[in-house]
Amino acid sequence: VAARALLALVIVAGALVLAGCDASSIGRDPTTEGTTSILGRRAWVILTTDGGRRLVTRRSVRIERGDTALDVLSQVADVRLAPDGTIAQVNGEGGGALRTFGPEQAAWYFRVDGIESLGVRPDRFRVQPGQSIWWDLRRYDIYERLPVAVGTFPEPLFSGWRSDPRPLRIAHGADFQEDAEYFRDSIFERLDPDVVSIAGDGGVAGIGGEDAGGASDETDLPVAVRLGRANFIIGRWEELRLDPNLLDINLDSRFYGLTTFIAGTTIVRQDPDMEFTEELRDAEGLVWAATTDGEPDGTLAFVVTGITDEGVHAAARALRSGACQFYLACAVDRDGRVIR
């Protein structure tokens, strides 16, 4: 009997480990994920290079009270520190590759639940159970900052900046109400978000459709972004670009840390390791995330868009399936295949 009980315990523990390693974390409750009576307090550690283009490892690790971002990194990799306490190498990689005119400017950055933690020392950031700590080795001469990534969806829409969530608002274009309601019901049900049409939210003229005056300012301009909210937006770019916040982000991609964007009727990409932009000829759909002021604690805009209806639907499918994991932004063809 004792042997059977022990075997049952091992099977249960094994099942929990496998469940914790499921590639798709969509729809999980981030307040309890990774914390069980058998496995203890846990967090995810992700290790990539070049803005997520190369996945090195992804592991669920046990954490103790007081563990920092540096502590959990040390559980999955060999970490070497510089004399000033910054990270010099991880698994022997650090700094930039040697080029004709010297080494590239590159460093290790970490993000928490998809939001980059600039100015926060990793040996002082205390990790909480269920959090995702994503370390990436990337160049910093092209993008000074990359505030938000889509690769840990549905974060940061659940947890927000430093576990300070904001009310979720889902806005959709004219032909994407069903998609918006699907995300609400299957992924964000616990948050009970508003679902509104970007053309019919009663918005008025002003920055991002925010109230800027009396009745004389009323307009039919689409209202995709509300300041002070977590905004999940789905629709064709020709509709979404009428929102001033989204248009500004798309036009000044380097300032806002947007590595893939729409130029005219083409989706283009410039990852942190790319000197020049690249046209993605087969891309029709795109998922990107940013903040309205370029700061990690700013108003979040998480955008599912495209240059065709088919592209928008394909981007939504890719996001739901987990195909966009570990990407800063995610471009797809009309069949939902991620363009690497």
Give the location of each predicted region.
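Bacterial lipoprotein signal-peptidase II cleavage site
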Residues: 22-29
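Bacterial N-terminal signal peptides that target proteins for export
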Residues: 1-8
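Eukaryote-biased recognition of intrinsically disordered, low-complexity regulatory segments
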Residues: 36-59, 165-166
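Hydrophobic, secondary-structure "cap" segments at the distal end of domains
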Residues: 70-120, 124-125
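C-terminal motif of bacterial Sec signal peptides marking the signal peptidase cleavage site
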Residues: 18-20
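A structural motif detector for short, solvent-exposed N-terminal "entry" segments of globular domains
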Residues: 30-34, 62-64
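Solvent-exposed alpha-helical segments and adjacent loops
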Residues: 24, 126-340
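OB-fold ssDNA-binding interfaces and closely related basic DNA-contact patches used
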Residues: 51-61, 67-80
